[in-house]
Amino acid sequence: MNEDYFLRLARRLRIPVARAELIHDREGRAGLVVQRFAGVLVDGEVRALAVEDARQLLGRYPADQYSLTSEQVSTAAATSCPARAVAARACLAQFVFAWLTGNGDMHAKNLSALQEADGEWRIVSAYDLPSTLPYGDRSMALSLDGRRQALTRKAFRSFGTGLGLPQRAVERTLDDVLRATDPLLDDLRGGALPLNRNATQDLVRQLARRRQDLEE
């Protein structure tokens, strides 16, 4: 499945990623089971943890989840966490990963902060990571550096420093995500996604261009 592959790929990043397992029913139909992250086991009982997505942190309506910017949602999520630099890096890494994998559905409800049992807030493990590019979705869900397409290393550099990260940390994060996604193109050529030959070639071509733009 699409999302199962990209969740596994995302585990190469140096950020938390949602735990998931691909299962099949008796008819062989596949389904993805994702572990809940909004609860913790205490004395044998599950205690709910507070979770707020970026839209909620900004006090916006549900309909606004696509009308905000990457800068707005990342700033809201990162500033809710005491370890702001760690949170900002996680936000940057998630948006870079989304661009390099063709995930055009990284909207304001897909970036959240969670309050741990000890009361500290942190960025929630990355989740909802499908590639939507094979289905004609060629843009980011939210604008970044003023645009949704043709994103470059310069655009992500501006985005990261705007979140308060030192330029060296931004460059390191960009390189980390590029390394983490290095197997992607070969995996796609090898049939990692259930696409026909033409769709696979088109996806590889577009993602290769995105990588080139971030490597420059």
Q: Which ranges hold each PLM region?
A:
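Small/polar glycine-rich anion-binding or flexible loop at a beta-alpha turn
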Residues: D25-E27, C91, R172-P183
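Short coil/turn segments at secondary-structure boundaries
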Residues: S67-E71, A88-L92, R172-T173, R189-G190, ...
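A short beta-strand motif that forms the metal-chelation/ATP-contact edge
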Residues: G31-R36, D182-L188
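Conserved kinase catalytic-core segment
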Residues: M1-L13, T69-Y135
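Short coil/loop linkers at secondary-structure junctions
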Residues: P16, A83, G164-Q167, P194
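Conserved ATP-binding subdomain of kinase catalytic cores across diverse folds
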Residues: M1-Q65
